[in-house]
């Protein structure tokens, strides 16, 4: 059975890139466009990994991550923060919110797949 990745990303173009990259690598994807949709998605199906954009409408990635981490059934699900706002201290902020890893945009497909595979190994 293929691993399920929840992609939380508000930009359709970025979701399409991830859909192509991760789908071609054999992963099953679920998508959410904001933090609230992410919470609804994890309530329906527990993913094996979450790629969480930080800058999101409605509820940002930090708040969504903190909420996900309050659910005992989801504590072990790896969350990788993905952001284009890679400023000093952002990685620490993402880790403090409960993310397990961090990758900044633009990322190389090879680097992203390597990080995903590391957390799903």
Please place each PLM-identified region on the residue numbering:
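Charged docking surfaces used in two-component/phosphorelay signaling
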Residues: 16-24
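Acidic, metal-coordinating helix/loop segments flanking the phosphotransfer/catalytic sites
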Residues: 6, 31-49, 92
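The feature encodes the CheY-like receiver
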Residues: 45, 57, 75, 87, ...
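C-terminal output helix
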Residues: 107-116
């Amino acid at each position: 059975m293929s691993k399920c990745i929840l992609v939380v990303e508000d930009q359709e173009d970025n979701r399409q890139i991830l859909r192509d990259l991760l789908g071609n690598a054999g992963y099953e994807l679920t998508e959410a466009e904001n933090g609230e949709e992410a919470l609804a998605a994890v309530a329906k199906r527990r993913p094996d990994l979450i790629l969480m954009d930080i800058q999101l409408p409605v509820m940002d990635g930090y708040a969504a991550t903190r909420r996900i981490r309050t659910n005992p059934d989801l504590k072990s699900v790896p969350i990788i923060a993905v952001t284009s706002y890679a400023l000093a201290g952002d990685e620490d902020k993402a880790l403090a919110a409960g993310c397990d890893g961090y990758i900044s945009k633009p990322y190389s497909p090879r680097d992203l797949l390597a990080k995903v595979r590391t957390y799903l190994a």
